[in-house]
């Protein structure tokens, strides 16, 4: 089996996963964002409110996966990506799913995320943002033979501890969902 140890291959692999998630959980309704792999202190990923990338004359959102978080179990990477895709889905429909400068995830976010095989728990500061994959999402990953990513940036900081699964799943690290500020707001 090939191993994901090269950055360029990881980028392509994340695009493949995004396409599979878009098909399964959004009926291909999401506009394709540009996937980036950058440092995201205190977060596993983010999506931009604005369309900050130009690609072949088309403006596109950015969906970032934290460079220092790539060696988490693949189901956690998938849960982070799906979390950010829910923000994109809500954004495309004009649904405000965050407040307090884009940091507090409200029940509109929670409701859409739980429809898509994510377990969403409440955080006292950031709202409905603590994200773990459900058993169904873990099975989705297994059914598609998704493999672990084996390249990671050493960021020198620690992310929040795991909340663990509530439905018999292994203890898994949560997605904070906090994003960097882009323009006037952030998700």
Please give the residue ranges for each predicted region.
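Metalloprotease/metallohydrolase-associated module, dominated by Zn2+-dependent proteases
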Residues: 2-63, 67-71, 92-184
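Short basic-aromatic helix/loop recognition motifs at nucleic-acid
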Residues: 76-80, 98-101
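Active-site recognition of the HExxH zinc-binding catalytic motif
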Residues: 79-92
